[in-house]
């Protein structure tokens, strides 16, 4: 277990989570000044709106940095553990807070957010996010999910946007999402086929990401 060397990243994870948890009611107060937000019904969808707005915004902001992590790994074989661990802490904390802040969340979303926490903890404490472990495809999966930030933005904005703009936003989001999925799944299959990772670990990981 890599507990001692990752102590500060666990603190990052907790600090990010607390910050996002506090952010929800703060945003709710601000957004209640917007008529279209106030009229969102049922009311629990307002938390759904905030959840996707926060996630879409944060993922959008870290997309350029995620791109450089991926670029450096592919072309220069640079696997920057510090950057990866910080980004992973941020990514996981967003989904953790959603589990507590969003009421009546769909079961599939609950499972997804929960598995993000499991993969984060396992990758950090069991594998130390080391290259050539199961952590590698997990990180790449997260990076491509980051690139698809417009999907989360769309899930929020569809509740308040004009239909005219919503169709354009939906089209762009769909194209980006499909493109990211194609590249991501191609890499996942390629890596899992060629890597020397334990077969049972590969099998469990494959089953989880396909559910």
Question: Which residue ranges define each predicted feature?
Answer:
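Juxtamembrane helix-loop boundaries in multi-pass membrane proteins
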Residues: 40-58, 108-119, 164-178
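Hydrophobic alpha-helical segments
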Residues: 69, 126-127, 192
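Non-cytosolic membrane-interface motifs at loop->transmembrane helix junctions
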Residues: 78-79, 108-112, 136, 167, ...
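C-terminal transmembrane module of eukaryotic multi-pass membrane proteins
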Residues: 151-211
């Amino acid at each position: 277990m890599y507990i001692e060397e990752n102590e500060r990243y666990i603190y990052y994870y907790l600090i990010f989570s607390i910050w996002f948890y506090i952010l929800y009611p703060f945003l709710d107060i601000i957004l209640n000044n917007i008529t279209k937000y106030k009229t969102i019904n049922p009311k629990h969808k307002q938390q759904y709106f905030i959840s996707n707005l926060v996630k879409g915004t944060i993922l959008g902001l870290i997309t350029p940095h995620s791109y450089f992590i991926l670029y450096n790994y592919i072309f220069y074989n640079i696997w920057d553990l510090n950057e990866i661990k910080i980004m992973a802490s941020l990514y996981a904390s967003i989904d953790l807070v959603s589990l507590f802040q969003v009421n009546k969340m769909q079961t599939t979303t609950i499972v997804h957010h929960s598995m993000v926490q499991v993969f984060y903890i396992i990758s950090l404490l069991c594998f130390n996010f080391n290259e050539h472990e199961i952590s590698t495809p997990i990180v790449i999966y997260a990076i491509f999910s980051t690139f698809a930030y417009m999907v989360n933005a769309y899930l929020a904005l569809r509740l308040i946007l004009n239909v005219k703009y919503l169709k354009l936003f939906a089209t762009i989001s769909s194209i980006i999402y499909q493109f990211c999925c194609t590249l991501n799944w191609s890499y996942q299959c390629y890596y899992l086929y060629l890597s020397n990772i334990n077969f049972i670990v590969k099998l469990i990981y494959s089953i989880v990401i396909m559910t």
